[in-house]
Amino acid sequence: MKISRIFKTIFLLDFLGGLNIAIKEIFKSKKTINYPFEKGKISPRFRGEHALRRYPNGEERCIACKLCEAVCPAQAITIESSERADGSRKTTRYDIDMMKCIYCGLCEESCPVDAIVQGPNFEFSTETREELYYNKEKLLDNGDRWENVLAANIKADNSHR
């Protein structure tokens, strides 16, 4: 054995080095949060639960262009529309199968009027599979519930679009 190794062994230098690291780590600030009681900060680009937005006058934003349905790689979106008296289209059915959805965000990017968005809600577990089949009413309710946050997130992300 080399003399330096004997010296380290006698004076427990390897042990003291490890102990030094452990003591430093004890006094560092904690990185974890106490999850259901504390929530971490969410990015404005977070892809959570889907929502359909309305204009400030209460009219639905969706113009039934079906771009989101066409671009969805998982084919999770189904849209049906009818024609209004003035010639424009109205969405009669807007369904998203959340079991198929891969949360890629392509539907949100393709929408020309920011009608379909992915909101900040990540706590939407259910007890049955049927609850993961979102219809137009459920999506509009989500949009109404999260409108303030959604509008702020879109405004914050506007420079990156």
Curated annotation (Swiss-Prot):
Entry annotated with the keyword Zinc-finger: no
S-S pairs: none
Gene3D superfamilies: 3.30.70.3270
Membrane topology reported for the UniProt record: Peripheral membrane protein
Single GO BP term: aerobic respiration
Co-factor binding comment: Binds 2 [4Fe-4S] clusters per subunit.
Family affiliation: Belongs to the complex I 23 kDa subunit family.
Protein name per the record: NADH-quinone oxidoreductase subunit I
